[in-house]
Regions:
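Charge-rich, low-complexity intrinsically disordered regions
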Residues: 1-213
Length: 213
């Protein structure tokens, strides 16, 4: 499984509870989210990855680059830095696609366009499943996988394809929260979620309580 820089400090285990549901920060996840330095630094990791990402951004003719990036991210044969760069690039790609409405079927769309949307949604599901697998792993990459997952969730909430309430209750967020709660051997993961998200964003805290109630 992927790992971060071994020099990066690992938080000490401590007791932590989800903040009370009536404690308000006045912030929502789609309004702001702190970027993990590892995600930002991945821009400088691997010219091949950046080229593939740019080609996807330039034209849908290069959407097959998504498959290539996914292969790089999941391949045990690739260097750790390259794999991390690839999965971060994939998240940026899908954040843009969500913002552009490319994962939504529009009225009057051609059959070819509908096929493309279905294909993109399938690739997005692949990425989500991979991130959840990483979140559930007992290594330091699960922290970055959590941050990447929350970045995608932010994009989903900013560009909803259905009602926000349904997205929170049944979408990627609910699956990710279940994965965190099932990772009983990794308290640091829960601490990260509580400190960075549940305490910081009203909507994350509210739907955390809604889902676990």
């Amino acid at each position: 499984m992927l790992g971060l820089d071994e020099n990066q400090p690992v938080s000490k285990k401590r007791k932590r509870t989800v903040p009370k549901s009536d404690e308000k920060s006045g912030r929502r996840i789609h309004e702001n989210i702190t970027r993990d330095p590892v995600i930002a630094n991945s821009h400088s990791s691997g010219g091949q990855v950046l080229l593939l990402e740019k080609q996807i951004q330039d034209s849908q003719r290069h959407y097959n680059n998504i498959v290539t990036l996914y292969s790089l991210a999941t391949s045990q044969a690739e260097e750790e830095k390259q794999r991390l760069a690839a999965v971060a690039a994939l998240c940026r790609v899908f954040c843009r696609l969500l913002a552009d409405g490319r994962l939504s079927k529009s009225n009057g769309a051609s059959q070819n366009d509908l096929v493309v949307v279905d294909w993109l949604k399938a690739r997005y599901a692949d990425l989500q499943n991979f991130l959840l697998e990483c979140v559930s792993s007992i290594d330091t990459f699960n922290m970055t996988a959590l941050t990447l997952s929350m970045a995608l969730i932010k994009s989903e909430m900013s560009n909803p394809r259905t009602s926000l309430d349904q997205l929170w209750r049944t979408g990627f967020f609910s699956r990710m929260l279940a994965t965190i709660l099932e990772s009983s051997d990794n308290e640091d993961l829960l601490h990260k979620f509580v400190d960075s998200y549940a305490q910081q964003f009203d909507d994350v805290r509210h739907y955390t309580f809604v889902i676990i109630a």
